[in-house]
Curated annotation (Swiss-Prot):
GO terms for molecular function: ATP binding; photoreceptor activity; protein histidine kinase activity. Photosensitive kinase that is involved in increased bacterial virulence upon exposure to light. Once ejected from an infected animal host, sunlight acts as an environmental signal that increases the virulence of the bacterium, preparing it for infection of the next host. This photoreceptor protein is directly related to the bacterium's survival and replication within host macrophages. This is Blue-light-activated histidine kinase. The modification S-4a-FMN cysteine is found at C69. SUPFAM superfamilies: PYP-like sensor domain (PAS domain) (SSF55785). Residues 93-147, 232-281 form the PAC domain. FMN binds covalently to cysteine after exposure to blue light and this bond is spontaneously broken in the dark. The modification Phosphohistidine is found at H288. Residues 19-93 form the PAS domain. It comes from the Bacteria. Keywords: ATP-binding, Chromophore, Flavoprotein, FMN, Kinase, Nucleotide-binding, Phosphoprotein, Photoreceptor protein, Receptor, Repeat, Sensory transduction, Transferase, Virulence. Residues 285-367 are annotated as: HWE histidine kinase domain. It catalyses: ATP + protein L-histidine = ADP + protein N-phospho-L-histidine.
Length: 489
């Protein structure tokens, strides 16, 4: 259904009377879904919706006209996004925002929404104009070029201003290029994206000078490809005259003939490229952590089977140790894998024992954040040591206690981390004939992750473990060298 724009856009006399009107052509050319609302009517209703909007949402014109745009919202729409839009409209300010909207079919989609107020010559608000872009599959989809046209008339200043208005509202720059001469005509938004002044003459070489050297040849090849009449799309980097590197995406197509004219659009996609790079980084980090987790699981399996010959007991031990590993991962997930404090690690790993042995497990020390790998190693070590204490140590009788302390101390002029596990008032302990899983965790995994020295003493008063490690940013994230010294008595 064609919708008349004349009641809402200030054209001159007879501006829409011709089928080849460049403004109408530009609307069809970009296929940009657009709405116009009237804030002077109750509830700021829609008074214009172009065919692209109807196609995007699946609604008919009579289903949207006269309604507030909120009908596109649904249960998945973030209330904070809705509040931001309301605030911008109330303040008569433009806003760019990504929001979840819903089509008539009920299908949700990410809508890159741009809303801009339109004022008259006296500065009075007349309408709100909005453009939409479905960015569900990609963060920044550009408008496709329309079917080939013989000419795109920009003969009058009025027509050119109207075309610039549309592409600027959509944050998309529009340009034309004479294929053989390289002379270009650019919209105001296009000039802003490239950093050109309003009156500066623009040539293809002017743009090419901004393109980074690594991307320049590809841009030239794509530009020459346009003469075939086939549309092309390219992403490339430029360095602005202010020295800022930006990612741009251009889509173009040539109107072939005796004097080919290339029509194109350009959009700044720097933020999208940053998001893609961050996504790739996160994917690599997830893969790395998965490998580390699998290595830890394999180690638990090997150590459990090596020291346990009873299948039922091995299965029980493996399940308990795997549960401890899972609790460590849950703790890291809550902290976005930024590590955890030693206090958090102790509390989580020893929670199953505190309920049974109330007031017999004590912990104290400063707030110290350790890396994710150390978090896992400490969690398993604490759990295994507590399990052994229940079987053979301080928690195997009615009065034994465990004291876990940690501090920063000076060792030979160097700040170091000192942690102690001290059992007392339990039965006399003796050094086992061979190392169990707990000792292997201390001497292999924990010592390696902390770059630490681990001393284990089977004293008559109870098990005593001292861990001494250097202060490094890899192990203690964010910790500087000016750490107050705190000794363990």
């Amino acid at each position: 259904m064609a919708i008349d724009l004349r009641p809402f856009i200030p054209f001159g006399r007879g501006a829409l009377s011709q089928a080849t009107d460049p403004f109408r052509a530009a609307v069809e050319f970009t296929l940009m879904p657009m709405l116009i609302t009237n804030p002077h009517l109750p509830d700021n209703p829609i008074v214009f919706a172009n065919p692209a909007f109807l196609k995007l949402t699946g609604y008919e014109a009579d289903e949207v006209m006269g309604r507030n745009c909120r009908f596109l919202q649904g249960h998945g729409t973030d209330p904070a996004h809705v509040r931001a839009i309301k605030s911008a409209i109330a303040a008569e300010k433009p806003i760019d925002i990504d929001i979840i909207n819903y089509k008539k079919s009920g299908e949700a989609f990410w809508n890159r929404l741009h809303i801009s107020p339109v004022h008259n010559a006296n500065g009075r608000l007349q309408h709100f104009v909005s453009s939409q872009l479905d960015v569900t599959l990609e963060l920044s989809r550009l408008v496709e070029l329309e079917k080939e046209r013989k000419t795109l008339s920009i003969e009058t200043a009025r027509s050119k201003d109207q075309l610039d208005y549309i592409v600027e509202v959509a944050n998309i720059g529009f340009w034309t290029r004479e294929f053989y001469s390289g002379k270009m005509t650019c919209s105001a938004e296009c000039r802003r994206i490239y950093g050109f002044t309003p009156d500066e003459p623009v040539h293809f070489d002017t743009i090419l000078d901004l393109v980074v050297l690594e991307d320049r040849m590809t841009v030239v090849q794509k530009a020459h490809q346009a003469v075939t009449g086939e549309p092309y799309s390219i992403e490339y980097r430029i360095v602005t005259r202010l020295g800022e590197t930006r990612w741009l995406e251009t889509r173009a197509k040539a109107l072939t003939g005796e004097n080919p004219l290339v029509l194109g659009i350009v959009q700044d996609v720097t933020e999208r490229k940053k998001a893609e790079a961050n996504k790739a980084l996160v994917s690599r980090e997830i893969a790395h952590r998965f490998k580390n987790s699998m290595a830890m699981v394999q180690s638990i399996v090997n150590q459990t089977l090596r020291n346990t010959y009873d299948p039922e007991q091995a299965n029980r031990l493996f399940s308990e140790r795997l549960r401890a590993l899972s609790q460590a991962h849950d703790m890291l997930l809550k902290e976005n894998w930024a590590g955890a404090t030693i206090q958090q690690i102790c509390a989580t790993a020893l929670a199953p024992f505190n309920s049974t042995f109330a007031n017999r497990i004590h912990m104290s020390g400063p707030h110290l954040l350790v890396s994710d790998r150390v978090t896992v190693a400490l969690s398993l070590a604490f759990y295994e040591l507590a399990t052994n204490a229940v079987k053979y140590g301080a928690l195997s009788n009615e009065k034994g206690v465990i004291n876990i302390t940690w501090a920063i101390m000076e060792d030979k002029g160097e700040k170091k981390f000192h942690m102690r596990w001290a059992e007392s008032r339990g039965p006399e302990v003796m050094q086992p004939a061979r190392r169990g899983f707990g000792q292997r965790l201390l001497h292999s995994v924990l010592a390696e992750e902390l770059k630490a020295k681990c001393d284990v003493e089977f004293a008559a008063s109870g098990l005593l473990i001292d861990v001494l490690a250097p202060i490094t940013p890899e192990v203690f994230p964010g910790m500087g060298h000016n750490v107050p010294e705190q000794r363990i008595a």
